[in-house]
Amino acid sequence: SIQVIVVTDGERGLIYPPLSNIR
């Protein structure tokens, strides 16, 4: 199974998966 970790940015309040565009 593929587990996707959702990262939340408290400053912008955006939810994005761990892609190559991680800040």
Swiss-Prot record:
Does Transcription regulation show up as a keyword for this record? no
Keyword annotations for this protein, in alphabetical order, are: NADP, Oxidoreductase
Catalysed reactions, semicolon-separated: (S)-malate + NADP(+) = pyruvate + CO2 + NADPH; oxaloacetate + H(+) = pyruvate + CO2
EC number per UniProt = 1.1.1.40
UniProt key word Repeat: no
- Single GO term (MF): oxaloacetate decarboxylase activity
Q: Which family does it belong to?
A: Belongs to the malic enzymes family.
**Assembly and partners?**
Homotetramer.
This protein is called what? NADP-dependent malic enzyme
Species annotation: Populus euphratica (Euphrates poplar)
